[in-house]
Every structure is written in C-alpha cells, then in structure tokens.
Design a protein with these regions (language model features):
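Beta-rich nucleic-acid/ligand-interaction surfaces
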Residues: 134-136, 233-240
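Bacterial N-terminal signal peptides
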Residues: 40-51
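Ser/Thr/Pro/Gly-rich low-complexity, intrinsically disordered segments
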Residues: 1-8, 12, 16
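Bacterial N-terminal signal peptides that target proteins for export
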Residues: 30-42
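Short linear loop/turn motifs
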Residues: 32, 230-235
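Short, positively charged and aromatic/hydrophobic N-terminal segments
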Residues: 16-19, 23, 28
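Extracytoplasmic cell-surface/polysaccharide-interacting catalytic and binding patches
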Residues: 55-129, 141-228, 236-249
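Alpha-helical and His/Cys-centered functional microenvironments
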Residues: 14-16, 39, 236
Length: 249
C-alpha cells in the first residue's frame, strides 16, 4: 500500500479545524460575555490600585534622604560640631566629620534666624544637627542613661524610636557676637545639671537673658525649644520626618 501523501485536502483540514485528520476536534469555546469581561477589568483595576507599592530602597546619602548641608544655605553660620571631637560628654569623637545636615525646611528656617541675628550684630554657632541612628546607638552604648541619651530602638533592622536629631529635625546651638566669640549662657553645652534648664533662675542674669534672646529668635521662625536644654530646638513638624541612619563624611 502506498504511503498516504500529505496533500492539499489534509492541509485544508488542518486549517479549517485546527486538528489533523483522525483527531476529534475540540469543542469550540464560547466567547466570554461582555458583562463578565467588564467585571474582570474592574476587579483587575481595583487589585492594582490597592496592591502595596514596592518598598523603595533606603537612601544612602544625605541628599537622597532629604537633608541639606546648612553651610550651603547659610555659609556664615559657624560650626562647632562637638561630637566630631572628644570635647563632649562622651569624651570620644563619634562623628567621622564636622558636618551639619538638616531637613530642607529646617535648614531654611535656621538661615532666616541667622539673617535676622546678623542685623543685630549676632550670629549662630551650631553644636549638633542630624545624627545617624547608628551614632545614637553608639551614644547609648557609651552612656546608657535615658536622662542624658534618647534610647534607640530598632525593629527588623529599621529604627523605630530614637532622637529628633536622628530625623534631621533638631539642632543644638548658641549665640556668638560679630567677631564669632561665644555669648555667655547659663551653662556649657551638654551640661546635664539644672543650669541647662530654661526655667533656671540662678547664675548670671545676663547669661539667662542671652538664652532667652536665642530662644526668641528661634521661636520666631517656628522652632520649638526643649525645656531641659537651652541649646536644643526642634523644627516644626518634626514628627513627620522619619528616623534616618544615613552616614555622612
């Protein structure tokens, strides 16, 4: 018997039925009703809308985290970043560099304070600004006392409790005269006695008046004074800034 040739009729059968001869043709699928198609489209759109967005990568630079170098905004603000030197309550240099980074809004407000004080023959000198969370942890390892250091807490490797400095929304500073010399204050920086408190009534009246003058200048631009430290001020809306662990150098 001669082998069966694959002729025109066989190819036509395949084109017409989608099956080779001898095969049972599959049952033709019915088209999806229009209302079912619309329902599927709506459900798909809702799923896409409510699906959680992919978590963005953590920032690795101050700029990516929304921090600005204060000296770029107000170059005439003096820096005395104590934690970049041993001249602080830990007696250890814990910062790799003497830099001052703050949230953009906070930095701009500080620049306005500086401009206003300059008209009065005064200026600002900054002791501390943004503090990476890892440094806060180092502070705690050196001085585990909540009266002096905000206890840092992390969950799944992410900071959940820390200092307002970790948010880039707090600044420690003092006043200087036109020559850059410190103006007398009730106590030194990082003094954890009652002299540091804003309600302290002892000591030199002129020093207390200077602290009040600094407070008035900062409050004018929206800063919130910390009652226990005459040098510490929080930027408005600090609660809306996340805790950061972005290094700087």
């Amino acid at each position: 018997m001669a082998p069966r040739r694959r002729g025109v009729n066989q190819e036509q059968t395949v084109l017409d039925t989608g099956k080779l001869p001898g095969m049972v043709a599959a049952k033709k699928e019915m088209p999806m009703p229009r209302h079912a198609v619309l329902r599927w489209m709506v459900l798909t759109a809702l799923f896409v809308a409510i699906a959680p967005a992919a978590r963005a990568a953590d920032p690795t630079t101050p700029a990516a985290a929304g921090l600005v170098d204060v000296t770029k905004v107000a170059p005439d603000i003096k820096l005395d970043i104590r934690y970049a030197t041993p001249n602080n309550f830990t007696h250890v240099a814990v910062y790799p560099a003497a830099r001052c980074f703050l949230r953009t809004d906070v930095a701009n407000r500080l620049a306005k304070v500086q401009a206003d004080l300059k008209k009065q023959g005064l200026g600002l000198k900054v002791f501390d600004c943004y503090r990476p969370f890892a440094i806060q942890q180092k502070f705690w390892s050196l001085v585990p006392n909540e009266d002096w250091v905000a206890k840092p807490v992390a969950k799944d490797g992410k900071p959940v409790i820390g200092s307002k400095h970790n948010r880039g929304a707090a600044v420690d500073l003092t006043l200087v005269d036109a020559s850059g010399k410190d103006i007398p204050m009730p106590s030194g920086f990082d003094d954890f006695t009652e002299k540091a408190r804003r309600d302290y009534t002892g000591g030199d009246p002129t020093a207390r008046a200077n602290a009040k003058r600094l407070e008035a200048a900062m409050v004018k631009e929206g800063f919130e004074p910390l009652p226990s430290e005459w040098w510490h001020f929080d930027g408005p809306g600090w609660q809306g800034y996340e805790l950061l662990n972005v290094p700087f150098n």
